[in-house]
Design a protein with these regions (language model features):
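Ordered, amphipathic secondary-structure segments that act as subunit-interaction surfaces
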Residues: 60-103
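Helix-coil boundary and interhelical linker segments in multi-pass alpha-helical membrane proteins
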Residues: 1-5, 57-70, 120-131, 187-190
Length: 190
């Protein structure tokens, strides 16, 4: 039951982008096309889940054992950077089109505060490994859901005339807020 609550909460209620405001840069930057958003979501899901496992193990079996907690942030960043490099190499071989579409945003996963934030939150909330993985994967699904919905809406908005003062970031942030309201109201209606 606890896993179901974590799953639903991380996707809908405490969405990492829409409620906790982590990962806004890729959310706004890679959300112009649904196809690109789906690719970015998959890459973030992979890196986020694997990074949570690796950082959890490093925290419990290295940093805590040797009382090196002050190295947590830099260690986690290095782990995330290594995983992103691995994803970049794999995508370049497997899907060159997606690799090109993601462009500069793929290496920027390294600095995506969503991934570092989740790795640190798992430690701060004192989750065990399985609970941490469920939380990380659910958070990745929530990030992906928000990103794909937002990309779909931005594709539709590109077809209509938007007043000059609302174009770009203003309408994007209003749309993100409406997505958050709709996800929260969906849960309230159940």
């Amino acid at each position: 039951m606890e896993y179901i609550l974590i799953f639903i909460s991380a996707i809908f209620v405490n969405n990492i982008v829409l409620s906790q405001f982590l990962g806004i840069c890729p959310f706004l930057g890679v959300s112009k096309k649904v196809e690109t958003a789906m690719g970015m979501s998959a890459a973030v899901a992979f890196v986020l889940t694997i990074a949570t496992i690796v950082t959890f193990l490093i925290q419990k079996f290295v940093l805590d054992v040797f009382d090196l907690g002050y190295l947590q942030t830099i260690t986690f960043i290095l782990v995330i950077a290594g995983l992103v490099q691995m994803v970049e190499i794999i995508l370049k071989k497997v899907s060159p089109a997606l690799y090109q579409a993601l462009g500069v945003f793929l290496p920027l996963i390294t600095t995506n505060c969503c991934i570092l934030g989740v790795a640190i939150l798992v430690i701060q909330k004192d989750y065990d490994l399985l609970t941490g993985v469920v939380y990380a994967f659910s958070t990745a699904l929530g990030f992906g859901l928000a990103l794909v919905l937002f990309a779909g809406l931005r594709e539709q908005m590109s077809l209509v005339k938007i007043p000059k003062g609302m174009q770009g970031t203003p309408i994007a942030l209003i749309t993100a807020g409406l997505i958050n309201l709709s996800l929260c109201s969906l849960l309230l209606s159940i």
